[in-house]
Structures are given as C-alpha cells and as structure tokens.
C-alpha cells in the first residue's frame, strides 16, 4: 500500500513523532495506522508526545558570537543530568550554530531548518532526542543581536545557567573590543539590569515606581517642594539600580558602566556605544513542580 501525505500527517498527529519517522513506520507496516503506532512505540518514539506534558526547567543556555552577530538559545530538559548528556549538548550547540548561520529570530523558523546528517528538521530531531533520552525537552527562546560595525560579545556563566549578549557599535575592530565586551557581559550576568538606559525604561514601570516613591515621601510629612526634590533623588537611585549604563560596574564599583565604556572609547581612539544587551537565566519564569521527598518515600513503602 502506498504511503500518502495525509497518512503521514495523521500518524504525526496521533504520536507527535517527526514526519520522516512516521513515513518510515507506515512503510514498514504496509500503511496500517495502528501497526505503525505500535512500531513507533516499540522504537520508543511515540512516547515523546506524552513526555511533552512534563515540566522542563533544567537544560542549558548557549551563545555564539560571530563578530558583528550574536545568537543566544535556551534549550530545556527535565533534569540537570540530561543537561550534561553529550547528545543533548550537541543538539543545543548545533541548533545555536544553525540559528546564527541562517539569521533565525524565532523558534518556529529554527525548528523548520534541516538538522545536518539526519534527514530531519530541527523540530523533528528534538522529538527524536526526547524519545531517545526519555525526557521532555523544549527549544524555549532565542535572541539574535547584530551591529553594523563593532562586536556582539557573548558570555556563559555557571556552565549554561546564565547567558548574555552585549552589542557594541564602534569603528574599532572586533578584536579590539573583545575585552570590553566580555567584561560588560560578565557585569550583565551578575547585575541583571532590566533596561539599557533611562530612555528604554518602560513607562508603566517608571510611573509605578514614581507612585510608590511619592506615597512614601508624603508619609514622611514633608512639604511638597521637598517631596519633589526627594522624588528626583530617589528616581535617580532607581535608574542606577535597573539601567545597565547607570549601574555601578561590578568589577570596579567606583565607576558606572557608561564611564567604563567612555574610558575604553578614549583608549581605542574612537566612539563605542552599547546598543543593546540580552540576558537569559535558565528556567526563569517556569513553574517547577515541588517534590515532597518524604511523601514519595512513604508512598513507596506503603506500596
């Protein structure tokens, strides 16, 4: 019996397995849909869809800098053990390289790219990896940064727990900007700024902070003219906490980040501008299931 595209589509919808593997299963079973499902289950592939319901909050953040272009990717798995698996790490690194080489700015585009040496695309290779390793995994998010001239520097902290990109626009060579870029990326990893500068502060966040500060100042019983000066000072402190260029430089807290950039520009003999940054912390925002170890032991003992 000839295997049709609609049959492959139906089997994929039933199992969550990649197109090529579905086609092979149908070919091996003479087009028998139920037999094809069983064939995939025996190969450990059809279980991948069920695993997708499990929380994947571990994994790793990967980065790749290609001079004026930088890419960062977060790939999640269920356990830290799997995050150190060679096949998982190879997949994460390969996906990052593919994203950089093909100009990817979103996960769907990345998933559609051919995964080298497999006959599958990136999304289907991920499904295959889920079935092989036996854990849910997820290509969670991607960031791509580019400058017309200069360097996009990258940094990985704690073996992939935190990743950073920093974009430096400058006529200086990428090599000349390497040290500054790396140190600024390390600063971002440690200080976790929320915005690049005052101009990029979200207006809602700014008004919310200002409202809180006004209420606090009024509670002190000070007159309005004094309160106004207090708010200006406290907002300056707020900006110094959340804006990268106004933060105290972690390597030299006596200087702000912008001062460090200005000093580097003077030394290089040309302007240097930080045009953007991105920071991924592994698993941030993912709600993890809290395990009650004592309850688990009791359950096992009680049978």
UniProtKB/Swiss-Prot annotation:
GO molecular function: translation elongation factor activity
Key word Cytoplasm present: yes
Principal subcellular localisation of the protein: cytoplasm
Domain of life: Bacteria
Keyword Cytoplasm: yes
Compartment(s) of residence: Cytoplasm
Pfam families: EF_TS
SUPFAM superfamilies in UniProt: Elongation factor Ts (EF-Ts), dimerisation domain, UBA-like
NCBIfam families: tsf
PANTHER family tied to this protein: ELONGATION FACTOR TS, ELONGATION FACTOR TS, MITOCHONDRIAL
Protein name: Elongation factor Ts
């Amino acid at each position: 019996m000839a295997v049709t595209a609609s049959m492959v589509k139906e089997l994929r919808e039933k199992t969550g397995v990649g197109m090529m593997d579905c086609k092979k299963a149908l070919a091996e079973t003479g087009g028998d849909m139920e037999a094809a499902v069983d064939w995939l289950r025996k190969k450990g592939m059809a279980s991948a869809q069920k695993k997708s319901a499990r929380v994947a909050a571990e994994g790793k953040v990967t980065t790749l800098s290609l001079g004026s272009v930088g890419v960062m990717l977060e790939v999640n798995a269920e356990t830290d053990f799997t995050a150190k698996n060679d096949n998982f790490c190879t997949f994460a690194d390969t996906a990052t390289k593919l994203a950089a080489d093909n100009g990817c700015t979103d996960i769907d585009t990345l998933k559609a790219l051919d995964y080298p040496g497999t006959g599958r695309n990136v999304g289907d290779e991920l499904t295959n990896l889920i079935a092989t390793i036996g854990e849910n995994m997820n290509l969670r998010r991607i960031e791509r940064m580019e400058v017309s001239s200069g360097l996009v520097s990258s940094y990985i902290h704690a073996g992939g727990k935190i990743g950073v990109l920093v974009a430096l626009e400058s006529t200086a060579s990428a090599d000349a900007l390497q040290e500054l870029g790396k140190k600024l990326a390390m600063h971002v990893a440690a200080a976790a700024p929320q915005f690049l500068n005052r101009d990029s502060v979200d207006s809602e966040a700014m008004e919310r902070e200002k409202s809180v500060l006004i209420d606090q100042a009024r509670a002190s019983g000070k007159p309005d003219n004094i309160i106004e000066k207090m708010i200006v000072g406290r907002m300056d402190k707020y900006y110094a906490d959340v804006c990268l260029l106004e933060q105290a430089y972690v390597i030299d807290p006596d200087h702000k980040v912008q001062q460090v950039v200005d000093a580097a520009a003077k030394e290089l003999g040309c302007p240097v501008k930080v045009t953007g940054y991105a920071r991924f912390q592994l698993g941030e925002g993912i709600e993890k299931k809290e395990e009650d170890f004592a309850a688990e032991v009791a359950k096992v003992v009680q049978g």
